[in-house]
Each structure stands twice: as structure tokens, then as C-alpha cells.
């Protein structure tokens, strides 16, 4: 614990490494994102990380969480960044803060606010007057929140990042210097650093004078550190993101990495004298609509709700094998750990819940949204919306015996209805797909419901506007004159439920459950297809029969003693019950995305961890022929098209030797 009146902390560097208050210091840190953890559980998760032996925690700052609309800022409750940092400091932990403004993080739009994209001419992450004006206005608010927490003022913040992995995107040094100078001018006096993949191209694009150069990688520690030493000839070697785990896209297996292998690399880094940030220490959850997405040039790849990341502290606070092995290694290098982890929070007993209320989304449109009128079907951002669904309606003229309906610039997934009947599904990965339409003499009402499945958070396709970007055509004729209804679905209190079942199409379904003592639980939806779940008004996240995720984590603080309400928005066909589980494992075995059967739970591919179909790429992303004998070993790829902005990857060939960089191949996703 820190004293009630702590002394200033200084983190500096000399030729050999870090100095903390003048003494040699090795940073052993764990990443935890406050915006992925319920605030009532911040202390629990931080205590678990402290018990693993780390002396520091690291967090990104998600701009879009704090400024959901231009000029409207929130730093209360789940957005109380200062409270999170103070709490870490009270537990005796130093804090590294990475304010971006771009953070990647598998978070919607890499943490940038969606409203930036309302201006179709804005240019992101470079010296663009409109973008920099928004960033400067944000930093004018953010830095005063963080300044009192700096180590020089007795707070726990010892270092801050400048942008994030910028060399994987661009090389505008003037932009990075603008961010650096902006932090300094606003009073940030702690150590500053940039971080990029441990490849020459990345480092050349992302480093700037006067700022510590650090790396991100998950394999080949000796080679990675050697590359880092080229760009940081003296001073500390730092792996700001040690990728011991990985995130998941819908339709993939859950990614895991052998704990012994992950521990061996951590041991190698610490033995080399490097400072390390374990990414992630605790992954948490992409609650609500906040998940990010990748794009590999051919396939859009949205992330699942869980951000478990195969971390040492699991999504619900579990202490995994990695936790215990990492603790042993950290203890060996830095000394005994003085703290033990708290007991695992209690969990609710399993039960099956019947539905007691239903209402269709179409019948609720006017209760959930205010209608806008536009000539063209504008994007979400142009309609003043960032997250959720958006509904478009127009009147088609008839008679038209046969026509093909196309959506130009769809992002991401559209259900199409003619006079209230669903006629098909369109997705962004099939931009040339069309639906056959017959319009009767009197015309027909066309409804299009589009889901934003998560903005791309990495690569050249970052400007990922949602909804309908260009237009809707019948054959070659664009349709004009649209009613547009933004559906952020952040308040469902106006819904009017009835007992009459709604068995098909987008609809809300309700169940009520009595709870004696609030506790953690997992929500399973057997027989349901795709949608979103709310608990007592809080959006838990998306579900999708595609997997790999089969349950949603419902933290104990969201429950209350007495009556609790679960609302499920099902976009297609609902199940008949909702299951409360005491484990993330579903009640029954589900088909894997490939059609094979797999054991229940989310560690579905332990025999071949990270096997997602890879090929190698050199430093410039040029892929040689694929080799079918390799499985992924330790990866972190955020994809882009027209340029391969791959980060450092490691593969293990079946003979056990490591290979060079790689990138994930396109993975087609069925419905």
C-alpha cells in the first residue's frame, strides 16, 4: 500500500536500464483495461495481478468511451479513469497510461470516437487539421484528469505512451511530434515512450527523438530484443506488449497458448534484463457493442464479446495455469511476492429461465428512435450515431416483376424486408450479392436493418463508416427518399412487452429472475441465433451461434437482490429458454465452426494452439508460399488491405523450429 501522503516517483533511464527514484529497476507489468472491467471489480482484478508478482499495471485510455459525442465528456462510474489509477496506486502498483489517441486494443475504431467519421474528408492518424483539432480538444480535457496522478506529484503514473504502434500504419513524424509536444505542453513530465512491432519497418515509422523506443512481440525474444537494440542503442529494452495469448473472431476457435511455452518466453525476457508488460494480465469483456474488428483485405473479421485473451487472470477472475507459472518466474527474477490473490467471487447456481414477454423491433421503432429524413441512406456517423443498429425505410415504386436489389457500401450486415417479410441477408464480405425483388402494382415498403458489428481497429481500413455508405439500387437505379432511424439501444425502458410470442425476425424477448444474493453468472442462449443481451439495462454483449463464444459473462455487481430482468434482442430465430450457468462452459456440446464436434468450453484447440491457417511474411509483409505443417505459436496480427501491416509473429513448425513473420489468411464466415 502507498502511504497516505506518498513521495514523488521518478522513472528515468541510464545507459543500462530504468532507474526508479535513482535505483535500478526492472518493470514487470500486466495489462488491464478499466473499460473492460466492471468498476466494482477493479480492486479484485488489480489485487489478483499484484498477487502474480507484477510491480506495475498498464492501461490504454479509450477516447470513444469518454467522449461519445463531440464535447460531451464522462469520467464517472465505469469511465472514472482517475479512480482506477488511484486504486492501483493504493495497492502499491505503478501505472503506465497509454492515452493514444489511437489505441488499437481490439476495441471499436481503435478507441477513436465514431463521430470523427461524420466528416467524410477527415484523415486519421496524420497531420490533418480536423483530426488534430479533435485530438487537441480531447487532450485538453484528458491531461488535467491525469496530471495530478503523475509520479512527480505523488501519484502512481510513471510513464505514458505516444500514439500506439504507429509504424504499422504510417510514418508522419510531424504527427507524432505534435502528440509528444502536446503532452509536454500540458504538463506531462513523466517518461514518454513509443511502441512498435519488433521489425525494422515498424520501428523506422514509429519512433521519434527524445522518446524511449519500445517493442511489441510474442515470440523469438532474442531476435526481437536484438532488433530493438538497433533502435534503442542504450538504455532499457522494453516489451510493452508481450503477447502470450490472443483474441478471437466470430467463426474461429478460441485461441490458447501452452502455458509452459508462454512462461518460458517470459523467463527469457526477464533473464535478458528486459522490462515486460504482460498483454493481457486480465483481458475482461467487450461489453455492449464495443468490440473491434480486423480486415485481411478479403474478409471482415469482427471480434467476439469476450476478451479473455487466454490471460493469467481469466475473464471472470479465474487464476489460470499461466497465473501460477508466471508468478513462479517473476518471483525467481524479482523476489518473493508479498500478497495472495483474493478468493474467487461466488457464482450463481445454474437454472433455466422461461420467457415471459416479447415485442418485435419493427413495432418498437418509434419508441426507440427519432426518425430522420434523408435523400440518401446516410451512414450511422452522419446520423449522429456510433454504435448499435440502424434502420432504413423507403417506398419502392411498382409494378416491377423482377429486379435485383443491391446495397453499395454495406457495413456490416443487413436484413432486408419487403412489406414486413424478410427476403434475405446481405453482408459486407459479399459486396456484389443481390436479392431478387418483385414489387406489386401499388408499390412496396422496403426496410433495411443494418448491424454495426464493430469498427476495424487496425490497418489501412481504419475509417470504417457504418450503415449504408453509398446507396441502395434496384438493378442500376438508386432509390432515394429515406426514413432513417438510429438504434443505439442504450435505453430499452420504453419497450412494451406482451405474452404473445414472436417466433421470427428481429424482436426483444424478456425473462425475469429472482436472485437472493447477487453473484457472478454466465448467460447461455441454447437454440438462439444472433443478437444482444441486456441485464437490468446493462448491455452484456453480443452472442452468435457461429461461436466460439457460447456464454456471456454477467458480473455479480450487475445483479441485484430481488427481481432482475434479462432482455434478449434476437435478430433471427429465438430459442425458448435462457440458461444461467456457473461456468463459461455451455451445458451441451456445440458444433465447432468447422463442423467438427468439440468438448464443451472455450479452450477448444489445446492440441494445436492458435491454429488459424497462417503463412509467413517478411518485414515488408511479402508472403512466401504457405506451408501446411505449421501452427501458430504466438501471434498478434491486425489486418489491413493493400498493405500488409503485420506485427511480429512467431510460428512453430512441426519440427519445433521458429519461423519468421506471418499474417492470417482470409477466413470465410458463413451465417
Where are these regions (language model features)?
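N-terminal carbohydrate-binding accessory modules
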Residues: 1-56
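The substrate-binding groove and active-site-proximal loops of carbohydrate-active enzymes
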Residues: 27-38, 63-79, 117-137, 161-172, ...
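Aromatic-lined substrate-binding rim segments of carbohydrate-active enzymes
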Residues: 43-107, 180, 184
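Aromatic- and acidic-residue-enriched segments that line the glycan-binding/catalytic groove
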Residues: 71-77, 101-125, 176, 210-213, ...
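An active-site-proximal structural segment forming one wall of the substrate-binding cleft
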Residues: 81-91, 95-97, 121-156
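Active-site neighborhood of glycoside hydrolase catalytic domains
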Residues: 133-208
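Catalytic-core region of carbohydrate-active enzymes that cleave or remodel glycosidic bonds
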Residues: 218-314, 318, 329
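Aromatic-lined ligand-binding clefts that engage carbohydrates, nucleic acids, or primary amines
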Residues: 402-417, 446, 513-536, 543-544, ...
